Design a protein with these regions (language model features):
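Class I SAM-dependent methyltransferase Rossmann-like catalytic core
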Residues: 2-19, 36-38, 42-108
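Class I SAM-dependent methyltransferase SAM/SAH-binding core
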Residues: 117, 124-178
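Short conserved loop adjoining the S-adenosyl-L-methionine
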Residues: 178-184
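Conserved Class I S-adenosyl-L-methionine
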Residues: 184, 267, 272-348
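A conserved beta-strand element that flanks and buttresses the S-adenosyl-L-methionine
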Residues: 191
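Short catalytic micro-motifs in class I SAM-dependent methyltransferases
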Residues: 194-195
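A short, conserved alpha-helix within the catalytic core of class I
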Residues: 198-211
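Conserved catalytic/acceptor-binding region of the Class I
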Residues: 216-278
Length: 348
């Protein structure tokens, strides 16, 4: 499939984070929200915990789930890097023009820069895709609970906007799906990628309320739609898909219902919502991604329905053989959402 050019999209993930060398990102200090480079003490993140001691002028990140228990990172950086070209090709370009128009007409924007909050930024692929497609000076605030991912996102961030204007970044450590309008004070835009489907209905509602309260638009891309097409079709496709979708809904998470819930939540807060499909279209040139996706997709289905194990093992072997032979094509459906919240002072 055709890949649009993305700034630094092919940046390699370092084996270990090195010294921070990013414009606009201050070095870690004792009690800060980033552990010092090379440090393992305190490197694990407690979900729901904000920075131990924010630097002057910084707001603490807001809690997502105050479980009091330590969880492993949600995504491996290698997986995030592997999927980045497919994500870049899939995101909807049709939502960019209405977004640009809204950003140009934000109250106080004339001649000013953009402040973009990227929620659950991972390795920063959203910024690498979007920043070079927007004009004007930009300051990106990257939120994630994993300090390693935050470091990589910062050092691999784009340095210039579409018109050559400067792009700077800062990082905020924490699991931040629940935001408040105060946490978004001064924000021009909130972005997220592949986030909505791992949130609950309450968390999506809180995100919509925060964006509406701050009067900033939200571009939320690549939420799973619950539909997969494989060529050639197989009798087990439907059962695997249904079991995977049920797995996605575990623990009250929205999974494939996320976009509908988010659209309803933003609409209730007076936002204009636009949806566009953003499917992955995977062919022989995407064999590495297809293989990893297949293993995870079938594995989750079997975890949800163990009685599928024997048939699913044969199914996976057959699909992997077709993938290795360059004969498998997959469409994984996603949806992008643009919510144009009303500016807080009643502007355009």
């Amino acid at each position: 499939m055709t890949r649009p050019t993305t700034t630094q999209a092919a940046a390699a993930i370092p084996a270990q984070p090195g010294p921070r060398d990013v414009t606009g990102a201050a070095p870690a200090t004792p009690g800060s929200d980033m552990a010092p480079s090379g440090s393992t003490d305190g490197a694990s993140v407690i979900p729901g915990a904000g920075p131990a001691g924010p630097r002057p002028g910084e707001r603490a990140t807001v809690r997502l789930r105050d479980t009091g228990e330590e969880e492993p990172p949600r995504y491996a950086p290698e997986w995030l890097q592997l999927r980045e070209p497919a994500d870049a090709a899939a995101r909807s370009y049709d939502l960019l023009d209405p977004l640009r128009i809204r950003l140009a007409n934000l109250p106080g924007r004339a001649g000013g820069g953009l402040v973009v909050h990227d929620i659950g930024c991972g390795t920063g692929s959203m910024g690498r895709w979007l920043a070079p497609r927007l004009d004007g000076t930009q300051h990106w605030v990257l939120h994630d609970r994993d300090p390693y991912l935050l470091h990589f996102a910062a050092v691999a961030s784009p340095r210039s906007a579409a018109d050559g204007s400067h792009v700077t970044v800062e990082t905020r450590r924490g699991d931040v799906a629940r935001l408040t309008p105060d946490a978004l004070a001064g924000a021009s835009l909130v972005t997220a990628s592949a986030l909505l489907d791992v949130l609950t209905r309450e968390e999506v509602g809180a995100l919509a309320a925060a964006c509406a309260g701050a009067g900033c638009p939200a571009l939320l891309t690549l939420s799973v739609a619950g539909r997969v097409e494989l060529t050639a079709p197989h009798p087990l496709d439907t059962e695997i898909t249904e079991a995977f979708n049920a797995h996605q809904r575990r623990g009250g998470l929205l999974g494939p219902d996320a976009v509908t819930a988010a659209a309803e939540a933003f609409t209730e807060h007076g936002a204009t919502v636009r949806l566009n499909p953003s499917p992955w279209r995977l062919g022989p040139e995407d064999a590495a991604l297809t293989e990893q996706w297949l293993r995870g997709w079938v594995g989750a289905a079997v975890e949800e329905r163990p009685e599928l194990a024997e048939r699913a093992t044969a199914y996976l072997a057959e699909r992997l053989d077709a993938c290795a032979a360059g004969k498998l094509r997959v469409v994984v459906h996603h949806t992008d959402l643009l919510a144009l919240c009303r500016p807080v002072d009643g502007g355009a």
